Amino acid sequence: MDTSARPTMSQTAESAADGAAAEIHETHTGIVALVGDRAYKVKKPVTTDFLDFSSVDQREQVCVREVRLNQRLAPDSYLGVAHFSGPQDGPAEPVIVMRRYPDSRRLTSIVLSGEPVLEHLSAIADAMARFHAGAE
């Protein structure tokens, strides 16, 4: 990935400059912070039977790969990889920067609102079919 295209921390911080509180979601392998119109995802330094995120370099590689793969279907959603650094010395932590969408655009919210979902599901199915038709 071209590092010149990556968002800088000053660019990512601008999106949080409005003082919006962060909403944090945690899984066994990562943490996602929702701030303003951005979502920031970091990989935890964990090792399991199926993955190894134990080093910053490994987490960097995984983040770059995730962005590259997911930009194929969601180029406007996956914005790049930035880096967080703390007050202590040490390597900066890679963070995936994504566009945050309103909760009202989640399929769960659409279903719960009673809005018909057939068109949404058809659009998803069509996009997936086109994607897989072009796969090698």
Task: Please provide the spans of the model-predicted regions.
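Conserved ATP-binding subdomain of kinase catalytic cores across diverse folds
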Residues: D2-E136
